[in-house]
Design a protein with these regions (language model features):
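Glycine-rich, proline-tolerant flexible connector loops at the mouths of alpha/beta enzymes
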Residues: 1-24, 134-140
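Acidic catalytic patch
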Residues: 2, 165-166
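Conserved anion-binding
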Residues: 6-9, 47, 53, 64-140
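Alpha-helix-loop-beta-strand connector modules within alpha/beta enzyme cores
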Residues: 11-39, 44, 48, 76-86, ...
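The start of beta-strands in P-loop NTPase/AAA+ ATPase cores
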Residues: 35, 54-55, 126-128, 160
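Nucleotide/phosphate-binding site architecture used for ATP/NTP-dependent chemistry
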Residues: 61
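Short, charge-dense linear interaction motifs
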Residues: 142-144
Length: 166
């Protein structure tokens, strides 16, 4: 469940607006179902309130780079977290045609650094899922997403669950 788009050309949503979009929905779903709920946010306060409302996990498109308090919230709640690769360090991706010498080497280096950061901030590795950030999160050039799919087994070196989205 997400209350703020991260796609190219999207605009910022205030904290209050994002909370108004996601918290009532999480609460409603939780009263009717035990289905697994992941909140898509880069904001620590949204993550905190979503977890309090019944969300089970946090999907952070900034991989803990967008809000300095996010790692603290994840560690405090011992919540599963999805760390997504993005060529852009902000919560918005661009249509930039990024080129790579080796896209998988870039992803592996990124995840090594992000995993070290997460563990240094009290997030146990068993709580982490990695997402190579397909589409514009990698590049405006589709060939890099296809290369990631072809070589996805190289990310098994992290011994972590993988999440791939269209």
């Amino acid at each position: 469940i997400g209350g703020e788009s991260s796609g190219p050309g999207s605009t910022d949503v205030s904290l209050d607006e994002e909370l108004q979009r996601v918290i009532p929905l999480i609460q409603k779903i939780r009263t009717e179902s035990e289905i697994w709920i992941s909140v898509d946010t880069w904001k620590a306060e949204v993550a905190r309130q979503a977890l309090e409302a019944g969300a089970d996990a946090v999907n952070d498109v900034t991989a803990l780079r967008g809000d300095t308090e996010m790692a603290k919230v994840i560690a405090e709640y011992q919540a599963p977290v999805i760390l997504m690769f993005s060529k852009d360090s902000s919560a918005r991706t661009s249509k930039q045609d990024t080129d790579y010498v080796d896209v998988l080497d870039t992803l592996k280096s990124f995840f090594r650094e992000r995993l070290e950061f997460a563990e240094l901030h009290g997030i146990h590795k068993s709580k982490i899922v990695i997402d190579p950030g397909m589409g514009f999160f990698i590049s405006g050039k589709a060939k890099y997403s296809f290369e990631v799919i072809r070589r996805i087994s190289e990310l098994h070196e992290f011994a972590l669950p993988l999440l791939l989205g269209p």
